[in-house]
Amino acid sequence: MILLIDCSKGLNLILGNRKKIIQTLNKPRIKKVSEALVAEIENLLNSASKSYKDLTKIIVINGPGSFTGVRTGVTVAKVLALSLNIPVCGI
């Protein structure tokens, strides 16, 4: 399972595999991405009946966009990848 994190403008999450998109979340006008990101990832996984252990890769958008949003997304992606021992890729 692949998780894509895009906080460059608002909050966008995509959960999928190589063949299809399983679940998405799009909140373009969210104010505090740093406070909502982890909770929204958990909500996305729960709505797809998945857990963190199902993730095999994380992809994160590393710009251009909101400096704070991009920094938050990259930090959360790196922490998740490190704790789950899975690869992370910035694009």
Task: For every predicted segment, state its role.
Residues 57-62, 67-88:
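DPxDG-like acidic metal-binding loop motif
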Residues 1-57, 62:
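N-terminal beta-alpha supersecondary unit
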